[in-house]
């Protein structure tokens, strides 16, 4: 292996890796925003393999047929991010004229196949690429879960292997001639999956991120980090939704607070940080049941307070997407 192809050993670095470092083994080593002013920048720049990733033009061409690309993020696990992703996909796909795709990038904990009623399905490969599994005529789904020999198999991968799968999903999945919305479910926090998807999709453009939280401060602490990640990665924050905001009794329809907003909840956080607050969604046990059964919650309980709240959030999100397009047109 020639010197120009040698990966940098951490022992060669002049100083510890700073926060938000892309990693000395990354293609962005020495070139990222976090590299500016770093004592290691010259070392990383001189020894990293140069030249653009040959797969990037292929990814860009594949994704150029998709009108809107939305990332669904959460700072902490267990706040209902994947559940809300499934609700978002069902809600947009309710309009039969709109083609929707859902991509499950929560590689170590894929749950969208169960929630969308596609568990046990498999992916078919053709000359045009991988075909997503369609849970409705206008709603396709792609997940690593479809490739596992056993649904209970643990996925124990390091960053490089996760990165390779994400690249393959973006490069090889054939969503058809036209896709109106691609909703991407990501793992909680800021990890390899987030860095990979933002890097590969940067050229073709991401409409923005939807952040899901619950009202209590312990969840909001990590949301602040997620917002910081989006700003440093130049991802527009389309808005924040506060999930499990109150509990709706399925019998009396009364609402009570389960997770109290001790510091003002998501709405106050949005006011402090200047991001759109898209709304609050009450906790309804029937949502969990619908997800377990792989059924559309809106079909079963169209008049429930939770269904109304979710649809209001989806409308507000789509307004933000359109607003972003208008701002781009003005520029």
Curated annotation (Swiss-Prot):
Regions of compositional bias (Polar residues) in chain numbering: 1-10
Binding site for [4Fe-4S] cluster 2: 249, 252
Chief subcellular location: cytoplasm
Record SUPFAM superfamilies: P-loop containing nucleoside triphosphate hydrolases
Compartments in which it is found: Cytoplasm; Nucleus
Pfam families cross-referenced by the UniProt entry: ParA
Binding site for ATP: 75-82
InterPro entries linked: Mrp/NBP35_ATP-bd (IPR019591), NUBP1/Nbp35 (IPR028601), P-loop_NTPase (IPR027417), YlxH/NBP35 (IPR033756)
GO cellular component: cytosol; nucleus
BP GO terms, sorted: iron-sulfur cluster assembly
Top-rank taxon, per record: Eukaryota
UniProt-annotated binding residues for [4Fe-4S] cluster 1: 21, 35, 38, 44
Key words of the record: 4Fe-4S, ATP-binding, Cytoplasm, Iron, Iron-sulfur, Metal-binding, Nucleotide-binding, Nucleus
UniProt cofactor(s): [4Fe-4S] cluster
Disordered: annotated segments: 1-32
Record-level Gene Ontology MF annotations: 4 iron, 4 sulfur cluster binding; ATP binding; ATP-dependent FeS chaperone activity; iron-sulfur cluster binding; metal ion binding
Coiled-coil ranges (or none): none
SUBUNIT field: Heterotetramer of 2 NBP35 and 2 CFD1 chains.
Function: Component of the cytosolic iron-sulfur (Fe/S) protein assembly (CIA) machinery. Required for maturation of extramitochondrial Fe-S proteins. The NBP35-CFD1 heterotetramer forms a Fe-S scaffold complex, mediating the de novo assembly of an Fe-S cluster and its transfer to target apoproteins. Required for biogenesis and export of both ribosomal subunits, which may reflect a role in assembly of the Fe/S clusters in RLI1, a protein which performs rRNA processing and ribosome export.
Similarity remark: Belongs to the Mrp/NBP35 ATP-binding proteins family. NUBP1/NBP35 subfamily.
Entry-linked HAMAP family: Mrp_NBP35 (MF_02040), NUBP1 (MF_03038)
Protein name: Cytosolic Fe-S cluster assembly factor NBP35
């Amino acid at each position: 292996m020639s010197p120009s192809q040698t990966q940098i050993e951490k022992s060669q670095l002049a100083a510890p890796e700073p926060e938000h470092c892309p990693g000395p083994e990354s293609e962005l080593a020495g070139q990222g925003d976090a590299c500016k002013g770093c004592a290691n920048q010259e070392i990383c720049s001189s020894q990293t393999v140069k030249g653009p990733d040959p797969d990037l033009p292929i990814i860009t061409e594949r994704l150029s047929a998709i009108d809107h690309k939305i990332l669904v993020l959460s700072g902490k696990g267990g706040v209902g991010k994947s559940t809300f992703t499934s609700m978002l996909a069902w809600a947009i796909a309710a309009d039969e004229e709109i083609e929707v795709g859902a991509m499950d990038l929560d590689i170590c904990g894929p749950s969208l196949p169960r929630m969308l009623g596609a568990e046990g399905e498999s992916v078919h490969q053709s000359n045009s690429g991988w075909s997503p599994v369609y849970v409705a005529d206008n709603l396709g789904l792609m997940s690593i879960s479809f490739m596992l020999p056993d649904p209970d198999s643990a996925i124990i991968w390091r960053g490089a292997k996760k990165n390779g799968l994400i690249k393959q999903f973006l490069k090889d999945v054939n969503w058809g001639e036209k896709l109106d919305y691609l909703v991407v479910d990501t793992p909680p926090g800021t990890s390899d999956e987030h860095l990979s998807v933002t890097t590969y999709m940067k050229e073709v453009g991401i409409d923005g991120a939807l952040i899901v939280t619950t009202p209590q401060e312990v969840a909001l602490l990590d949301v602040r980090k997620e917002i910081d990640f989006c700003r440093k990665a130049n991802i527009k924050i389309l808005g924040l939704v506060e999930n499990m905001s109150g509990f709706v009794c399925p019998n009396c329809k009364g609402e009570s607070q389960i997770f109290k907003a001790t510091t003002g909840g998501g709405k106050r956080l949005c006011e402090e940080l200047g991001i759109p607050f898209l709304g609050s969604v009450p906790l309804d046990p029937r949502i969990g049941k619908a997800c377990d059964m792989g059924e559309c919650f809106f079909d079963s309980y169209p008049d429930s307070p939770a269904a109304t709240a979710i649809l209001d959030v989806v409308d507000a999100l789509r307004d933000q997407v359109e607003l972003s397009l208008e701002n781009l047109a003005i520029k």
